[in-house]
Design a protein with these regions (language model features):
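Extracytoplasmic copper-binding redox domains, predominantly the cupredoxin/blue-copper superfamily
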Residues: 2-16, 20-115
């Protein structure tokens, strides 16, 4: 009788683990990156290089606990300080290469190429 109890418990545990694994495999990652989005995390822009078509709006999202800014080196755009989970958007209308950096942490750099 005790042996049947342990067998049943083992089968239920294995079944639960397999169900959980199957469900987890089908779920998107919690931090899945949106198209045309640059994530600011660990004092880096990710991706560090992004190519978009003219007319595209790019969104930067700060996932760090520290504030960051999004600055174009040619002065075309400059965000306010973004706290954690804040976003900044800019629509690129002209083709070209746009160098971006954080005004607070200038070693953080990225490039947006607009076609």
């Amino acid at each position: 009788m005790l042996l049947n109890y342990f067998r049943r418990a083992f089968v239920v545990s294995c079944g639960s683990a397999m169900l959980l694994a199957a469900l987890a495999a089908g779920l998107p990652a919690a931090q899945a990156q949106e198209p045309n989005q640059v994530v600011i995390k660990n004092f880096m822009f990710s991706p560090m290089a992004l190519t978009v078509k003219a007319g595209t709006t790019v969104t930067w999202k700060n996932m760090d606990g520290e504030p960051h800014t999004v600055v174009n080196d040619a002065g075309i755009f400059h965000s306010t300080a973004l706290d954690q989970n804040d976003t900044f958007q800019f629509t690129f209308v002209k083709p070209g290469v746009y160098n971006v950096f954080c005004g607070i942490h200038p070693y953080m750099k990225a490039t947006i190429t607009v076609q």
